[in-house]
Design a protein with these regions (language model features):
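Histidine-dependent nucleotide/RNA phosphoesterase domain, centered on the 2H-phosphoesterase fold
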Residues: 1-164
């Protein structure tokens, strides 16, 4: 099925966001990296798998198509708790909305017609999810730069998960 209203996330850009900081001065990178290291130290390596598709918002015109976590959600949430605590302790500003772990697959184009958006919504309900499993051994601090061609992500630092 062709869904021209969807802007798919490039495979190399797929990620789970633990905390979104927005613009952060370069001189705070060590603090951000420290917060990531603190979070990673709380959690052992784990398996992450996905089992369902969904959309934001749940009703009305879809804007985001995502995959939901089947296995590993508790570990992702614990990483989020650790990241939030580390960022707060370093007086870093970030979006403190509750973490809703998901993997964004696509966004619905803002100029999509109502019919196209409705087709996307119906397609999500029919989407068969293949088994997707990953071993998670580290987290990364990622810089996102938006451009007309889409976001460009650069890894600035990584932090290995705890090895118990």
């Amino acid at each position: 099925m062709s869904l021209p209203a969807l802007r798919r996330v490039k495979p190399e850009n797929l990620h789970l966001t633990l905390a979104f900081l927005g613009h952060t001065p370069d001189e705070r990178l060590d603090d951000v990296s420290g917060a990531a290291a603190d979070a990673a130290a709380r959690v052992s390596p784990f398996t992450l798998s996905f089992d369902r598709a969904g959309r934001f918002p749940d009703r009305g015109r879809p804007r985001v198509v995502w995959l939901g976590i089947a296995e590993g959600e508790a570990s992702v949430l614990e990483l989020g708790v650790g990241a939030y605590a580390g960022l707060r302790s370093r007086s870093l500003r970030f979006d403190e909305r509750p973490l809703a772990p998901h993997l964004t697959l696509a966004r619905v184009a803002e100029d999509a017609s109502s019919a196209e958006a409705k087709t996307v919504g119906a397609a999500i309900d029919e989407l068969a999810i293949p088994e997707l499993r990953f071993e998670v051994g580290e987290i990364a601090v990622i810089q996102s730069v938006l451009s007309p061609k889409g976001p460009r992500y650069t890894s600035l630092a990584t932090a290995p998960l705890a090895h118990n």
